[in-house]
Amino acid sequence: VGSEMCIRDSFSPDDIDYLRSLHIFNDDFLEYLRGFHFTGDIYAIPEGTVVFPREPLLKVVAPIMEAQLVETAILNMINHQSLIATKASRVVYAAKGDGIMEFGLRRAQGPDAGTFGARAAVIGGCIGTSNVICAKEYDVPALGTHAHSWIMSYGDELTAFRKYAELYPNNTTLLVDTYDTLRSGVPNAIRVFEELSEQNRMPKKYGIRLDSGDLAYLSKKARKMLDDAGFPDAEICASSDLDEYLIDSLLSQGACIDSWGVGTNLITSKNTPAFGGVYK
């Protein structure tokens, strides 16, 4: 992943002026850079293709100077984005068909890593991202819910839920763990769904999000509460430091979760933070 973004085709006058100010390079080399255009050919597998260790990802056929000048850009783009796409694919595989949303921008190592990483995560199988810049620039689905601060900014949880449902009538996913998931959050969400049903304003897509606690236990209890209240179509989304191992464990415990928001551990590939691609 990242092969489509690798090649810089020229150096600007400002670039040349800066390089000259370093007093490292001679004038002949700087003049060469001023007129530089990559003339070689690059052969690459399509982005998103599964590859195995020691299998070439990309081949550069060019004069040695041109091939050398693009080395760092190629490795930077391919190593980082292939790392995140690989992590995303592992998370997606663990979820066994449930949707995985990329939620990692706040914990990414900088804005570029957050945006390129979100793009790579979608290539790796995520259904969308909470990174709106990435969604805009690369035409991928923008997805997400609201934050705990939304709830806390209102006088009470029920009022916050009602207002959110009013503002987002087609996709109402309510974050239920701000105060007490089973005694407050889920009951208040059910009450809002009942009110919407009575007013004939049920959203096309609706549900709750769990963001803390024992997700297996809470999801099973919440599922029963929603079903008993007459809302079997309500979806349950889970987040909270998820990765492929935790998702696999939760599913093996019978967790009633329909989709997953995965942030830190995906966007940083926390357990394997570097991809060892080389250029030879």
What residues fall within each predicted segment?
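Segments forming glycine/polar-rich beta-alpha architectures that bind adenosine-containing cofactors
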Residues: 42
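Buried, small/hydrophobic-residue-enriched core segments of structured protein domains
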Residues: 24, 30-39, 48-52, 57-229, ...
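Hydrophobic residues within beta-strands of alpha/beta enzymes
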Residues: 143, 208, 236, 258-260
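Compositionally biased, intrinsically disordered terminal targeting/sorting segments
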Residues: 8-13
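Short, small-residue-biased leader/transition segments that mark boundaries at the very start
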Residues: 2-7
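Gly/Ser/Thr/Ala-enriched C-terminal appendages of enzymes
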Residues: 224-229, 234, 242-280
